[in-house]
Amino acid sequence: MLNEFKAFIARGNVMDLAVGVIIGGAFGGIVKSLVDDLIMPIVGAIFGGFDFSNYFLPLSSAVNAPTLAAARAQGAVFAYGSFLTVLINFLILAWIIFLMVKAVNYLRQQVERQEKQEPEQLPPPPADVQLLTEIRDLLAKRPAV
């Protein structure tokens, strides 16, 4: 069973997936910082200087806090500002992944086109096969007895 597990892990697809997950996690942090630290402040400035992450609707009359964290401590809230921030994170990440996949597909198509244009050159046959081919050709040219 251990050998099967080693073979499973050593396969290329599993290793590629592991690398993709690790890079994706790190890249997700970059996109989150991009949205939280660069995009959302600009959007907030355009729409009145507010921080979208603190936009919420109280779902009970007991909630009267100015920030989302304090409001959550007081009761149930509908935190649509946090949702908008996460949605923008997702859309940016999905767009970047789409562009990366599109670029990889384009490169694959270019390689496939090149392979179709260049016929595959077979290596020359071994010397003994060449000799046998020459003998066959000479025998074929001899008149029948």
Curated annotation (Swiss-Prot):
PROSITE patterns: MSCL. It is a multi-pass membrane protein. GO terms for cellular component: plasma membrane. SUPFAM superfamilies: Gated mechanosensitive channel. One of its GO terms (molecular function) is mechanosensitive monoatomic ion channel activity. Its main location: membrane. The chain crosses the membrane at residues 14-34, 38-58, 81-101. HAMAP family: MscL. Homopentamer. Channel that opens in response to stretch forces in the membrane lipid bilayer. May participate in the regulation of osmotic pressure changes within the cell. This is Large-conductance mechanosensitive channel. It comes from Rhizobium etli (strain ATCC 51251 / DSM 11541 / JCM 21823 / NBRC 15573 / CFN 42).
